[in-house]
């Protein structure tokens, strides 16, 4: 049976070691996962990472939430500056997920995967509202990370320069798309590419 919650949010905070790489899932920063994310980072801090040379941060499916929940992961990465950094992306990354992407790029990540579902300059910090039988997501802030500008009111937005409003599209360093055949066979095209990318760099 199709698990919609798993598809929508994934398994934030879940991680595994594959040879000399840490693969960490940062698939949601919704408030409901706050404790889960914090506990996973605390657990990671106790792991022996001496033989881990690469951090693969998988933000695929991260449609946003509370951008402050990105900080636990980013601080952990900053405390391990000797590790190579790779970020996996897909079309389901939005809002605070794109903020995590920009943070990882700032930390030197090589991006592998698909284009994300939103421009780099976008609306974020959204809240969900239920009205009758309908659920709505309402964003309350506009961000342009590259120009370090933001707006929270109609007046502030109208006063932004045209440059600050111009759409900025993210293109991964290495474009890799999940194939239909691999999906049917349970193969993660993008992760497999990243693991082979690491292997080839070390040959």
Predicted regions: what is each one?
Residues 1-203:
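C-terminal "post-core" interaction segments
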């Amino acid at each position: 049976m199709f698990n919609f919650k798993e598809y929508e949010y994934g398994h934030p905070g879940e991680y595994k070691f594959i040879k000399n790489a840490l693969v960490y899932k940062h698939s949601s920063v919704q408030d409901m996962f706050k404790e889960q994310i914090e506990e996973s980072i605390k657990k990671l801090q106790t792991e022996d990472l001496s033989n881990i040379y690469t951090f693969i941060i998988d933000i695929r499916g991260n449609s946003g939430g509370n951008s402050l929940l990105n900080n636990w992961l980013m601080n952990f990465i900053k405390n391990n500056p000797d590790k190579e950094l790779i970020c996996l992306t897909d079309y389901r990354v939005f809002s605070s997920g794109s903020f995590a992407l920009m943070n990882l790029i700032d930390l030197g990540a090589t991006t592998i995967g698909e284009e994300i579902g939103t421009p780099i300059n976008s609306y974020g910090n959204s809240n969900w509202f239920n009205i009758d039988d309908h659920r709505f997501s309402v964003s309350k802030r506009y961000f342009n990370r590259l120009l370090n500008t933001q707006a929270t009111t109609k007046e502030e937005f109208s006063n932004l320069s045209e440059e600050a409003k111009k759409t900025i599209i993210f293109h991964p360093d290495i474009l890799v798309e999940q194939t239909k055949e691999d999906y049917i066979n349970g193969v993660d095209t993008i992760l497999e590419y990243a693991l082979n990318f690491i292997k080839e760099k070390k040959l």
